[in-house]
Amino acid sequence: MSYLPLRTFTTIILLIAGLTGHAQVTTDTSAVAETVERAGEKFLRSPNIRSLSVGVLIGGKTVRRHFGELNTGQGNTPNDQTVYEIASVTKTMVGYLVASTVEAGKLSLDDDVRSFLTEPYPNLVVDGEPIRIRHLLTHTSGLPGFLPLAWNGVFETFTPDVPYRFHELEQQYGKEEFWQDLATVQLTEPPGTTYAYSSAGTELLAYILEQVNEMSLTKQLEMVLTGPRGMAHTKLRLAETSEVVTGYWMDNEDPSPANFNSLWGGGVGVTTTLPDLLRFAALQLRADDPIVKRSHEVVYTNGGSRHIAYCWNVWRDKYGTSYNHHGGTSGTQNWLYIFPDHDLAISLITNHSGPKTAGKMNQTVHRIVRKLVDTRR
């Protein structure tokens, strides 16, 4: 799940977006490595931060660096085999599957989502406008952030017991309860009107993908994405798993439980490694791939700075276009940035989560991009 406040999110993205453009780009791996190491060490000095993994893909060359310890005093620095929860960055992979399904002619962005459901759900339409596939992709459906409603606001309390409260709620919830709750949702305006982040919407999208393609989301990921791209360590984890790295919430000394993922896993379910994330990033830099091209098409804009593609945040200025997504659990946070104009992608992952973590990570991205992309030329 992702709980970064909208104002903070917008400020961070505008800061990064202003750096992208027609410029001289550093591709020498030793220079890139030095930049990453300096930025990573600085991030590691932040309070409560135990570790960081950074990957940079630039000009077809990859630099990966790992910092700190996953558990204080144990000397266990993360490495290329460390498996992380990537939370809402999962949504970008779901977006890729949707683009693949649309490209195959099996799904349309204008399809009424009710046509894929087993009950009529008359509550999913306002003034004659139903929730459509495009609305689920762009968080404009009007659905709440989470179903059940009890999940909403838990993270924003920022209390020490957040990981355990949320985990308990997850364990008590399943698909049957999801459908019951979906029938009680009351939309306040026609879908497509307002952006409001919704993991519930992406879970519904995952269900629809399973119906249309007649296979599980797990199998679709394997066939369409992770298999062809050699992402052997990228999995959709449903229910608890002990295979992911331990993470920490705010000042807590005890680790947070991993996501339970009792639904379809389309909102937060993927776990992966840094090398696999960079393989996914390399795919996003392939302008010749028709599925990638489609998945980067803007589906919603508010007429201002917010543009949304297939689950990607899209940012534009006079220097070009970039794509990004944040993911956060009660124990990890990560950002994935794609800068096609500079053949550049950056992934950062830390096993700490708190209200300031995302901002600190983006300051680190800022330092890296500023060194690698010289906008003065």
Residue ranges and their predicted role:
Residues 1-8, 12-84, 100-108, 134-145, ...:
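N-terminal leader/targeting segments and the immediately adjacent pre-domain N-terminus
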Residues 24, 69-71, 112-120, 151-155, ...:
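Short linear capping/connector segments at secondary-structure termini
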Residues 24-68, 210-213, 218-223, 227, ...:
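Catalytic loop of the DD-peptidase/beta-lactamase superfamily, centered on the K-T-G motif
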Residues 45-53, 73-135, 189-201, 265-268, ...:
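Short active-site loop at a secondary-structure junction
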Residues 85-88, 103-152, 184, 207, ...:
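Active-site helix/loop module of the DD-peptidase/beta-lactamase fold
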Residues 136, 205, 277-280:
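Structural scaffold positions in well-ordered secondary structure
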Residues 136-137, 182, 294-295, 299:
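A generic structural signal for nonpolar/aromatic side chains embedded in well-ordered alpha-helices
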Residues 176-188, 249-261:
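The feature captures the short pre-catalytic strand/loop hairpin that immediately precedes
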